[in-house]
Design a protein with these regions (language model features):
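Boundary/entry segment of secreted carbohydrate-active catalytic domains
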Residues: 8-29
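Active-site acidic/histidine proton-transfer and metal-coordination neighborhood
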Residues: 3, 77, 81, 94-186
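Conserved beta-strand positions in the central sheet of alpha/beta enzyme cores
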Residues: 48, 84-86, 143
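Glycine-rich, proline-tolerant flexible connector loops at the mouths of alpha/beta enzymes
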Residues: 49-72, 91, 146-154
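Short, flexible/disordered intra-domain loops and linkers
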Residues: 23-28, 57-63, 161
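Non-catalytic accessory regions flanking glycosidase/transglycosidase catalytic cores in CAZymes
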Residues: 2-14, 33-42
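Catalytic domains of carbohydrate-active enzymes, especially glycoside hydrolases
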Residues: 32-53, 137-138
Length: 186
């Protein structure tokens, strides 16, 4: 059985922009302060902050309130606020169907590639760090993906056997409930 979270957002923050789609090697897209000033110049009030190591040290944010205060200050200096952290790439790696292993390996750190079990554990740990970091940043929402465990069932051929989708969702619940619990506990 899947538990429902009882925490709710009190208000919507924004307009906000998802920074991951604009990150690059050249200014103003190559660091957090520059990205924030760029977003503010376009009229945005908030940012969805990707947990990319070029923008935030997720493990440090999970452990250090001072570091989170520094990140918040960088964002506030541009006149913005963080609406949520995002762990889209890590979330995808929580539940990868074996048929997609090779395609999704590039989302993981190089030292974890070709090791699905280590990659999955890293992704779970990242999400749990994100839960703690979100709490330290005072965030009530989080953006992620749930993985590619069931993608092959969207347009199946040949027909899938009875119970396959239910089994897939049970496995997603087994993997995600500890992560969601970490958000509730943070």
């Amino acid at each position: 059985m899947i538990k429902k979270s009882t925490k709710r957002m009190e208000k919507i923050k924004g307009p906000a922009i998802f920074l991951a789609q604009f990150m690059g090697e050249e200014a103003p897209f190559n660091d957090l302060p520059s990205l924030c000033h760029w977003a503010a110049s376009l009229g945005y009030k908030g940012i969805q902050l990707p947990t990319d190591p070029r923008l935030i040290n997720l493990a440090k944010a999970a452990k250090s309130q001072r570091y989170c205060d520094e990140i918040t200050a960088i964002v506030a200096d541009a006149g913005l606020e963080i609406t949520e952290l995002s762990t889209h790439l890590q979330g995808q790696l929580v539940a990868v169907h074996p048929a997609y292993d090779q395609m999704f390996d590039s989302f993981a750190p190089k030292e974890l590639r070709n090791n699905p079990a280590a990659r999955t554990q890293w992704a779970i740990d990242q999400l749990k760090c994100a839960a703690k970091a979100s709490a330290r940043l005072g965030l009530k929402a989080h953006a992620t993906f749930s993985g590619a465990l069931l993608w092959h069932t969207f347009y199946p051929w040949p027909q899938r056997p009875p119970g396959l989708v239910e089994l897939g969702f049970e496995e997603l619940a087994n993997r995600w409930l500890p992560i969601l619990d970490a958000f509730d506990e943070a």
